[in-house]
Amino acid sequence: MRLKDVFVEFLNSKNIRCISTNSKKVLREDPIQFIARNFASGKFEICRGEGRFSFNLKGERIERCEYVAWKCEGISRDEIENELDKFPYIVVDCSLKHLHSDKELKSLIRQIEKTLSVVRKYMWDERLVIAGMKTMTSALHYESVEDFLREKKPERVILLDPNAGEIFHGERADCYIIGGIVDKTGNKKGTTSLIYERLVDNGFELERRKIVLRGDILGVPDRINHITEIVLKIVLDGMEVEKAIYDVQNRKIARWRLRREIAKNSRRIEVKGRPFRIIGKSFYEEVVGWLKINKKDFYRCASEMGVIVVDDELQSVAKEALLFKAEMN
C-alpha cells in the first residue's frame, strides 16, 4: 500500500470520511497523497475545523468538511507511527561523486530531484536519504550510508547493483540502497560493487541484487529515479517485476533491448549466393507486450541492423530450407 492508502484506512478507523486543508498546493496533485505526506512529515495534524479546500477520501472535491489537516494541535502522526515504520527507505549513496565530471554531477542532482518526486507519490520526503552529498532537496541527508545505518538500524538492507549475482524478485526490505552513479563516459562500470565491498568491510550485513528483464539487465531503466519507481511499484503496489519495468521503461531503453532480441531471433539466408538476415513480422507481437515499442521502432531497429522484415510464411520456408541443408551436410 502507498502512504495515502494507509492514511485513508486510518481516517476511516476514526470515522473521518472527508478531509480539508488550507494549502493551495493540494490542487496540484493527488490531494489525499499531498495531505497524507504532510501528515506523515509532521507538518500537518488533524483537527476539528473547516479548511479552504475539502475532499472526500477518494480525492474528489466536496463543498465542505468538518475536519482540517493543518498547523494545529490535534491528531498527529504518532497515532500511525507503527504503520509508517513499515515503509522502506530509499538511500542514494553518493560516496563516488568524486569520480564524476561536472556534467555528470549536474545529471546526478537532477536524478535525485526526480527521485524525490517519485518518493512523494508513494511515501513522503523523509523516506528518501541522500548520503555523501548535499542537495537542495527536503530529503534526509547523511555524511555516509554507514551513519544512516548506525542510526536507523534497518533489519534488512538490499543494495541494487546491476552486477550482482542474485536477482531482485520484489523482496521486501527496510532499506534499498541505490548507487548515486551517472556514467556518461563509460569509466564507472561495476562501481556499485565498491559500495557493497565498503559496507561489508565496515561490518554491515546487506544483500546485493540486480533487477533483470527476462534474464538480462539490458532494457531495465538505469536512472536513479526510474530504479526507485520500479522498486516502489513492486514492493508497495504489489506489481510484478516485468510489469513495473514496462511501466517505467522509455522507448529508447526498449530499443536497446529490441536490437538484442532481433539479433538473437533473426535468421541468415542466402539468395543467389548473397547472405541476408531476416525476421518474421510476427516477432513484433512477441516483444511488444514487454518492451515499450511500436511498429516504427521495430522496423527502424531491424533496418539499422541490416535485418529484413518478411512475411512469416517466407521465414518458415527459409527455416525449412536451412534444416534441409543441415541434414544434407
Q: Whereabouts are the PLM-identified features?
A:
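Beta-strand cores of modular interaction/reader domains in eukaryotic scaffold and signaling proteins
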Residues: 91-93, 129, 158-159, 177, ...
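Extreme N-terminal leader/targeting regions
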Residues: 1-89, 97-99, 329
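A structural/positional concept
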Residues: 64-139
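Structured adenosyl-cofactor binding patch, chiefly the S-adenosyl-L-methionine
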Residues: 194-257
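S-adenosyl-L-methionine/SAH cofactor-binding core of RNA-modifying enzymes
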Residues: 117-187
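Short coil/turn segments at secondary-structure boundaries
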Residues: 104-105, 171-172, 187-192, 314-315
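Structural alpha-beta junctions
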Residues: 111-129, 145-147, 198-208, 289-297, ...
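C-terminal, charge/polar-rich interaction regions
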Residues: 251-329
